[in-house]
């Protein structure tokens, strides 16, 4: 379906048995003055909790949401791709139910940037990792380092996901790749790589932030943690055999191993220094009130 010229952005929300996550997204957005966006919610849940939440929210907000109950369920990746196939906006943003906008004017800020820079194909947003039990947060990756990494070879994303979750990746709808259903661990980064190989015409919007909830025991990441090593091994073999990548991040020659070891040390030092910096200067003080506002509806529901 061709993008509707009147719609600038499609916010795509796949959900599965987690109405609280959808609640956090919807009640964290100010949609009163947003006229250039559509919101699509595609639901794989076997129960009607999400549908009830949508009905209640639309009565209060007067904002129309396109809601689809998948019968039968499509599975996570099938649901994501179905949302992308249904998007009508010029740009699309896929926001999972454990991700959320930090500020209520998130959509209007993003639309303003898209209108100001209409020639861009990709907008990268900043990502904040949020730990709801403690109320603390840390940057996914410091902005300066992220800016530098965005200039590196796209295949480095297979080594380190410096973009973050799909909610931090806004892409022109007609160019947005589809997620590879044969992947689990590398499914996000593989899509980013495919898009960056098509176009490096991107802009990093460090002032527009999304939160990523950490520590959920029923997340996809948690469900595969016990077999992660085997999954990564199989997927690397698949990527080598089907995508044709052959660089230092996949090879097993001595030089590649040395480079990966040095990179591992650098990355570890960067992670430690980021945490120390966050503690010393209280990085959370900037978005802390906004993050509390974002997670507060969950605590009160």
Residue ranges and their predicted role:
Residues 208-216, 220-249:
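Catalytic core of nucleotide-sugar-dependent glycosyltransferases
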Residues 105-138:
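Conserved donor NDP-sugar-binding/catalytic core segment of glycosyltransferases
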Residues 125, 145-225:
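Conserved nucleotide-sugar donor-binding catalytic segment
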Residues 43-52, 100:
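A conserved acidic beta->alpha catalytic loop
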Residues 92:
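Short aromatic/hydrophobic "clamp" motif used to bind/position activated sugar donors
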Residues 70-87:
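Glycine-rich, basic loop-to-helix element that forms the pyrophosphate-binding segment
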Residues 18-31:
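Short, well-formed alpha-helical segments that are part of the catalytic scaffolds
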């Amino acid at each position: 379906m061709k993008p509707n010229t009147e719609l600038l952005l499609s916010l795509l929300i796949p959900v599965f048995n987690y109405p609280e996550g959808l609640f956090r997204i919807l009640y964290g957005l100010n949609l009163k003055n947003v006229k250039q966006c559509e919101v699509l919610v595609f639901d794989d849940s076997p129960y009607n909790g999400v549908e009830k939440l949508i009905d209640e929210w639309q009565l209060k907000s007067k904002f129309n949401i396109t809601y689809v109950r998948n019968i039968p369920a499509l599975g996570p990746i099938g649901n994501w791709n179905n949302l992308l196939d249904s998007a009508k906006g010029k740009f699309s943003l896929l926001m999972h139910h454990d991700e959320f906008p930090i500020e209520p004017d998130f959509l209007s800020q993003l639309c303003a940037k898209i209108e100001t820079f209409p020639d861009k194909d990709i907008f990268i947003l900043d990502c904040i990792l949020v730990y709801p039990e403690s109320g603390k947060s840390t940057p996914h990756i410091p902005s300066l380092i992220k800016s530098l990494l965005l200039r590196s070879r796209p295949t480095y994303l297979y080594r380190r996901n410096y973009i973050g979750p799909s909610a931090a990746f806004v892409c022109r709808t007609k160019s947005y790749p589809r997620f590879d259903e044969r992947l689990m661990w590398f499914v996000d980064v593989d899509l980013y790589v495919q898009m960056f190989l098509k176009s490096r015409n991107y802009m990093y919007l460090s002032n527009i932030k999304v939160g990523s909830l950490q520590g959920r025991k029923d997340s996809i990441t948690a469900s595969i943690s016990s077999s992660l090593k085997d999954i990564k091994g199989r997927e690397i073999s698949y990527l080598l055999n089907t995508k044709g990548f052959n660089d230092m991040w996949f090879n097993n020659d001595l030089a590649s191993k040395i480079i990966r070891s040095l990179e591992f040390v650098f990355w570890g030092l960067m992670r430690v220094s980021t945490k120390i910096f966050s503690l010393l200067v209280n990085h959370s003080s900037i978005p802390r009130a906004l993050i509390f506002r974002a997670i507060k509806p969950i605590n009160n529901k």
